[in-house]
Amino acid sequence: MLMLGMNFSATLQLLLPISLTINLLQLSKCHHYVDRAILRGITIFALPAIGLALWASTHWSLSLEVFVAILVLTFSLQDRLGFVRATLDRLLEFQRTYITIMGLVHGASNLGGSMLTALAFGKGLDRHVSRATIVAGYILFATIQLATLYLAGEEWQIDFGVEASLIVSGAITFWLTERYIFTKFDSKKYRKGLEILLIATGILLLLSSF
């Protein structure tokens, strides 16, 4: 969206209601699987960081694509390279620091979701727990972002008709994915899918930084 000439605030105003709707629909089916320890860490450490960084981003912008790309690509290699696994195990011993940095990155660039996915992948969570925790985290992210934009006095720039049609499209996409795709994934396939997602995300972020 930034490439299409929309500023950061307008991009968030377009994407966040859609993301929030889809994730609420997902959470309604899997809320009992949420890893509450991770969610508590997000609430305490990430949300204030998101609010602070997003408020700051309304005054200046910061490019974090390369940082996030390197991080998620590193996480994607943990099942392939033993020394990467050992390094990430040590990194995740400082989970509060990681979550705080994730919040700062998300507030400044909206790229913290990739770091949350990497965290779930790195901890080797069961596919249901991983999915539910990521979804719950996204909901908290979107809620604090929308609240921060409102409190910062950002004028709403997106046509409500366009927003509503995109929300409906997102809900239909979720229903189709839930019905025909997710049910076909066991834990092994889900983890492989996350690995591919992290690799693709990292490559796309690197490409977008040039």
Name every feature range the model reports, one short phrase each.
Residues 1-40, 99, 103-107, 111-170:
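Small-residue-rich hydrophobic segments that form or flank transmembrane alpha-helices
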Residues 37, 41, 177-200:
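Interfacial loop-to-transmembrane junctions
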Residues 54-62, 86-88, 149-162, 184, ...:
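Membrane-interface helix termini and inter-helical loops of multi-pass transporters
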Residues 16, 69-72, 76, 135, ...:
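Residues within membrane-spanning alpha-helices of integral membrane proteins
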Residues 52-57, 61, 65, 105-112, ...:
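Hydrophobic alpha-helical transmembrane segments in multi-pass integral membrane proteins
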Residues 25-33, 54, 62, 66-91, ...:
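Transmembrane helix exit motif
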Residues 7-8, 60-61, 126, 186-190:
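A helix-boundary/kink motif common to multi-pass secondary transporters
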